[in-house]
């Protein structure tokens, strides 16, 4: 009989091991055997909890997107009466949370983005994440701008966030958070009306 609570512990071990494997050898070269070895479990455990490698990769992407959602929501909940500018910066800062800009997370996101073009489930998850970001940004800009301008500003800020993130990921260096904050803050203030 399995120990109570073991499923969540095992799932976490396997997701963490998957992130480590992707970080070290890439998604396509990360095998079930390597992941199981890193997690200290048998390959059968992966099949038991996730069916196969694709199921494990999907769960890993869901985990990363959940961490992103939580990072943004925690910052927004801390600003219930915040201005549009403050809330937009909170969304930006959530996207640059350590859970999203660590080496392992960045490599995993890049691998998932590339694979999402060929795997419908990963594509769907990527689209949900992208739409959520754009929706949050447009909603906050719309507090101060007409709908069309809010959509354009939201799209521009989403592109800036993705661009800063992608440049950092491809450089192999940590994201320069002060620079990212400064550039995104400048974009936000340039698009919001002044009092």
Swiss-Prot record:
PROSITE patterns, alphabetized: HTH_TETR_1, HTH_TETR_2
Domain HTH tetR-type, residue spans: 8-68
Biological-process GO terms, alphabetical: glycine betaine biosynthetic process from choline; negative regulation of DNA-templated transcription
InterPro entries per the UniProt record, alphabetical: BetI_C, DNA-bd_HTH_TetR-type_CS, Homeodomain-like_sf, HTH-type_TetR-like_transc_reg, HTH_TetR, Tet_transcr_reg_TetR-rel_C_sf, Tscrpt_rep_BetI
Pathway this chain belongs to: Amine and polyamine biosynthesis; betaine biosynthesis via choline pathway [regulation]
UniProt DNA-binding residue ranges: 31-50
Gene Ontology molecular function terms on file: DNA-binding transcription factor activity; transcription cis-regulatory region binding
Keywords: DNA-binding, Repressor, Transcription, Transcription regulation
Pfam families from the UniProt entry: TetR_C_6, TetR_N
HAMAP family in the cross-refs: HTH_type_BetI (MF_00768)
Function statement: Repressor involved in the biosynthesis of the osmoprotectant glycine betaine. It represses transcription of the choline transporter BetT and the genes of BetAB involved in the synthesis of glycine betaine.
The protein's name in its UniProt record: HTH-type transcriptional regulator BetI
Organism the protein comes from: Escherichia coli O17:K52:H18 (strain UMN026 / ExPEC)
Encoding gene (name): betI
């Amino acid at each position: 009989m399995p120990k109570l609570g073991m499923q969540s512990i095992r799932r976490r071990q396997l997701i963490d091991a998957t992130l480590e494997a992707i970080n070290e050898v890439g998604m396509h070269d990360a095998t079930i055997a390597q992941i199981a070895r890193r997690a200290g479990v048998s390959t059968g455990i992966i099949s038991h909890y996730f069916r196969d490698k694709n199921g494990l990769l999907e769960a890993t992407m869901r985990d990363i997107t959940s961490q992103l959602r939580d990072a943004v929501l925690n910052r927004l909940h801390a600003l219930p009466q915040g201005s549009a500018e403050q809330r937009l910066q909170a969304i930006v800062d959530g996207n640059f949370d350590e859970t999203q800009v660590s080496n392992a997370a960045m490599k995993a996101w890049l691998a998932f983005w590339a694979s999402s073009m060929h795997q419908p489930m990963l594509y769907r998850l990527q689209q949900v994440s992208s739409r959520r970001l754009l929706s949050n940004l447009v909603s906050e800009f719309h507090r101060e701008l007409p709908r069309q301008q809010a959509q354009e500003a939201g799209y521009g800020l989403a592109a800036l966030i993705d661009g800063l993130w992608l440049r950092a990921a491809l450089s192999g260096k940590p994201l320069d958070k002060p620079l990212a904050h400064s550039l995104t803050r400048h974009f936000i203030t340039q698009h919001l009306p002044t009092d």
